[in-house]
């Protein structure tokens, strides 16, 4: 009986760990900040968000650039039904979808550091058309933006 309880707890822990990793890698977690976090010093927005969301490369180095989109997730999901369907650069078998309207975004450009979390970013608010790939009519990955 005790062994069954231990096995159950191990499986329960393992399942939750896998689900946490899946949540951490979603487009919404990585790129959507709506409403935009109110960081007291706007110039520190990127540094705050990169640490809070644990944004880094798989080898734990700093990302050179990262974009946060300041729009409702529902509106971002609507990109997948956009008539602006184009071939993705470097992904020949996959189509990209471009938003029909410009979204407010913050571009975080690495200015200092190489290993996470010792990364420092420049904050640059902008607007642009968002490019995503879609899976089952939901954005799957953020590919960039067009001004």
Curated annotation (Swiss-Prot):
<comment type="similarity">
    <text>Belongs to the pancreatic ribonuclease family.</text>
</comment>
<keyword id="KW-0964">Secreted</keyword>
<dbReference type="GO" id="GO:0050830">
    <property type="term" value="P:defense response to Gram-positive bacterium"/>
</dbReference>
<dbReference type="GO" id="GO:0003676">
    <property type="term" value="F:nucleic acid binding"/>
</dbReference>
<feature type="signal peptide">
    <location>
        <begin position="1"/>
        <end position="20"/>
    </location>
</feature>
<comment type="function">
    <text>Does not exhibit any ribonuclease activity.</text>
</comment>
<dbReference type="InterPro" id="IPR023412">
    <property type="entry name" value="RNaseA_domain"/>
</dbReference>
<dbReference type="GO" id="GO:0004540">
    <property type="term" value="F:RNA nuclease activity"/>
</dbReference>
<protein>
    <recommendedName>
        <fullName>Probable inactive ribonuclease-like protein 12</fullName>
    </recommendedName>
</protein>
<dbReference type="InterPro" id="IPR001427">
    <property type="entry name" value="RNaseA"/>
</dbReference>
<dbReference type="GO" id="GO:0005576">
    <property type="term" value="C:extracellular region"/>
</dbReference>
<dbReference type="Pfam" id="PF00074">
    <property type="entry name" value="RnaseA"/>
</dbReference>
<dbReference type="InterPro" id="IPR036816">
    <property type="entry name" value="RNaseA-like_dom_sf"/>
</dbReference>
<keyword id="KW-0732">Signal</keyword>
